[in-house]
Every structure is written in C-alpha cells, then in structure tokens.
Amino acid sequence: MKRFSLTLLCFASSLFSAQGLNSQKETGTNLSKNINEQPVHQSVQLETDKVFNKLVNIRRIFHENPELAGKEKQTQEKIKQYLLDLGLEVQTDHYGYSVVGILKGDKKGKKIAWRSDMDALPNDYPDPEVFKSKVKGVQHGCGHDIHMAIGLGIAEVLSKNRKSLKGTVYFIFQPEEESFKGAKELLNNGLLSKINLDEIYGLHVTATPVGQIMVKPSEMFAYQKKIRIQLKKGLSEEELNGLTKKISNSLFRASSGSKPWEIQSIVDPKIGLTNPDTIFKDYLFTDGKFNTYSKNNESFLEAYLYETNSSNVDKIIPEVQKIFEDSGYKNQLLSVSFVQENPTVINNEKLTKSAIEILQNLYGKNAVASDYGQVPFFNDDFAYFQQKIPGVYFFLGGSNFEKGVIAMNHSPNFQVDEESIRTGVKSFSSLLIERLNRN
C-alpha cells in the first residue's frame, strides 16, 4: 500500500467498539446454517482449516526474509514452488519477479484473477514478532506477507475443489507495489494479451478488527495528487509562507469541525468509515506544510493533496492560479501542475454488490462491514488493473486489541493477527467459486 501517514500512531484500541468483535461472533453463528446448505463451501471451510498452519508458517518465512521492490527473487522462488506443488501451471516471464499461477477448473467458463502483492518496505522499525526480519533495514511492515499467504491459501483450497470450478483462476503475485510500478509494468508488458481476464480481485490488510471485511463500490481512497508551483525567484520567505497559507486555506473542504487528516479516526464508530455520517467523505486538504526549494534560479512549492470528488480535481489548478492573480503575484507565477497523479482504486459497482451479496449469504450479514468513506494518505497500484478489468479491492482487518496486536501499516510495532489469513482464504475462495458460476 503506497504512502502512509504516521498520524495513525495516535489511534487507540478504545475506538474499536465491541460491535466489531460481536459481529465476528454473529458471523460465526450464521455461518453453519448457510454453509451446510452448500457442500462446496463446507469443503472450502474444511480445507482452509487444514491448510491454515501451513500458511502461517510460510507467512512467517516471508516475514523473516523480506525483499524490497524489484528484488523479490527468493520470494518469487518460494511462491513458484508452492504453486507447482499444487499442480498449477506457473509462469514467471511476464515482468520482473512476478508469478502467475493458473488453475483450470473441470468446466469451461470465465477467467478470474486474484492479485497478491509481494514486496517489503525499507525501514527498521521495532518489530514485536518473535520471527523478526533477518534483513537489516527491510521489513514486511505493510502486510504483504499476509497477502501472499492468503493468495497461496486460496490457490490450495481451490485446487482441492477443482471439480466445482467453472472456468479458470489466475493467481497474480505482483512485485513492486510499494513503488507503484509493478501492476503498470505487468500490463505494459502484455499480461492481458496472454491472459484475457473477465474480473480481478485483491485485498489489503488494515488496522480494523481481525476478520472484518470492508468494501464499497467506487473509490476506496481519496484522489492523491502532488501539486508543484513554479515561480520566478525573488519572493521572500515571508511572501512564500503567506502564499502557501492562502493556497492551503483555499484547498480545504470538510464537514464542520471535522479533521479527515486524523486517520486514526477511521475506526471510530461515531465518525469512522462504518458510520454513514463519517468525516471521511466530501473533503479536500493538503498534507501538512508545502515543501519549498530553489533550483536553477527558480522557486518551487510542492505538497500532496487529497480530494474525494473526482469532478473537483480539474478545478484545483485554476483555483491556485487565481490565488496568484488575486494576490498580485501573477507575473511571478511560471506554472502550476500535478507532478504525481497515480490512479486511485475504484471498485466496479456491479461486482462489488455481487461480492457483498455472496459473502453475506454464505457467512452472515456481518461478514462484510459497510464503508461510507474514502481513506486519505493510502493508495494501491491495483488501480492500474481496474483501469483495464472490472475488479474489486477489499480491506481485511488484522488487529486484535485484546491481544495487543495492532495492524497499523508502515508504522513501528506493526503486527497482524494471523487469523486474518483464515478469514481471507475462506471468504475469498468462496467468492471466486461463486463468481465463476455467475455472469
């Protein structure tokens, strides 16, 4: 998951109401009744439980041996061998250290992909796990080790249920997500000319309660842009500070009194993502102070900004230009541009609604939590796949507050409750089976 704010360090487990834990219990109550009516999903649950300890072990191997974006060589080899042992066709010639496992069902049908990212982070934060990273300065601090374990688990569970598969499942293990490069390069190197996909799915572990799946149609994150303002040199520090203050004030929109940059509040039941009145909708703000620097006798002002409404993005540059005109600095302004415009994750509405229906029918109404907002600071290059293929991206909770496990990505003491692996494998194995059988 690309880009993150350490303000998440501020959040407290008290923000997570008992509702999150109770929903897991309720889901379990509804589970047996629905599953008993469908043998294939009984098998999914059984096979998930059988393979769980094996997946925990390989997750820990990944955690101990992390590799940075573009250097996932050992990780690729472990994934490749795991998939080969399952009897899958395996391809490693698409881009970099990617792996594509191909599982063909006994019946012809759709082609669906499950994507898992592979790379680790360049940091040396405290890690409370016994199975710490053995590589100095490199850690799986974003949960991609969990993602890979889930991807391999789904492959194994579905391979045991091949007779129930109507179509083909492609398991895309993607390198270089943290650099926001891997998905784009896979597509640029012709992945879709070799595998013509109908749908694609993926997930990211988050700091929400373990076992909680969260998803919504359309945007999961705010639109993230890096704006650059190029000026003739000559303005004083005081003048530059005054201009950046005006720009920040102008590029701000939020509900009265709300602070959508305080990302720890995403889990607050009163204002967080699961509340229809969440503060994480209809906002615009810049991320902290503008970075100012000089180069080639010119001055530059740069900042990241976050906008939830796509139709407002094109209004930002003209608005900044107007500030310079109104402030009497029009002649000092050389250009205003977005210098980083990564796409954002946008879930296909039809597939998202179908996924919610499937998971709730099988695993209870609380199997999927409602999401009413858009998260700032985060992003994922899964968005590049969604530009080409209808797809859905899920959040999967990894925190267990009773145990002191906080799945706070990109932060010190990052941990994930490994029960999230079980939830991910079971839920999304069932989802893929059902989606293969639907138009």
Predicted regions and their residues:
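Bacterial Sec-dependent N-terminal signal peptides
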Residues: M1-Q24
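His/Asp/Glu-rich mid-to-C-terminal helical/loop segments that flank catalytic regions of hydrolases
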Residues: E237-N249, R253, G257, K322, ...
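Active-site-adjacent substrate-binding region
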Residues: S248-Y283, S337, E341-G398
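Sec/Tat-exported extracytoplasmic proteins
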Residues: R59, H63-P66, G70, G87, ...
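Midchain, well-structured core segments that form catalytic/ion-binding scaffolds
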Residues: L197-E325, L334-T344
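Acidic/His- and Gly-rich active-site-bordering loop/insert found
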Residues: N30, N34-H140, A149, S164-L165
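Divalent metal-coordination and catalytic microenvironments
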Residues: F62, L83, G101, W114, ...
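Acidic/histidine-rich catalytic neighborhood of metal-dependent amide-processing enzymes
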Residues: I146-E219
